[in-house]
Amino acid sequence: LETLENAKFRYHVSNGEGCNKDRHKAKHLIVEDFDNIAAEIEAKLQDRLLFVIFASGGGTGSGAGPMLIDLLLDDGREVGAVTILPSPAESVKAHINSYECFTELTQIQGTAACFILDNNRGDKINLNEQFADDFNSFLEIPEKYKSLRGNIDRAEIEETLKAHGMAMIVHAQGVDSSQVIQALTDNEYAPAEADRTVKYITAALTGNVSMEDLEKAVGTPVDTFRAYSGEESICCVCGMTYPKTRLEEMYNKVAENKDTIRKNLEATQETAMQKDINFLNELQPKHREVPSGSGSREERRHLSKRDILNKYL
């Protein structure tokens, strides 16, 4: 929390000192403290639409994120997600966490847009900054771009962000369709599926950019919302299917390394030490056996401890 110098509100989850990539630990923390978390959100965030932001490969966000979204939806909130996929260079544990996280996230009904950043697309700090800039630019469209030819209002921005499924926002410099289409392919997000599923295309486009060209590139939406900009284009495509191909790559990485990791973990639990070095023990007089079940309760308790110690005698 100390790194969030400019955060308007901060809340420290009770007993939350990090989860060491343990998703189950994060879930228990949220369950135990949810009443306080919900009260904080209710008191400080009156917005109609909330986004829960988390890395899917860690422990805290990966475990708590989907659960928190589900709980907030149950409270009547409109909730979306901004989450991050681990790069192929990250650990197998990060990929396991991410895949389990998306298994839960994709089963939640009624979520708003899900923005899925991909650490395989570049430096993670740069990717985060790029997304924040693009998201803010999209929110500013109604105030920044007004034209007799067409406008986008706040309700259309909200309708776009409430669309269930994967979404992406791109910001392209240039005055023709090809540059916007290139931005929709080369960006900070997980690669889109090839099924061309899309609900809305909402964009402030320069005069030479054709909405029809964008539809040919990404798919036919239910509706489009367009404003007219100057020398830049800001485009949101939403209601897409989750990035199954990219998620399958993570699954395969785990599967390929499963046997090796299991063997390594089992090896640390085995010992090659010989147990017959102290031949002098064979010359010691035998201890008197104490019949099982005899004696007082205290004696039986000592017998139990003796059984444990006998493994080392």
Predicted segments, located by residue:
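Tubulin/FtsZ superfamily GTPase core signature
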Residues: 1-313
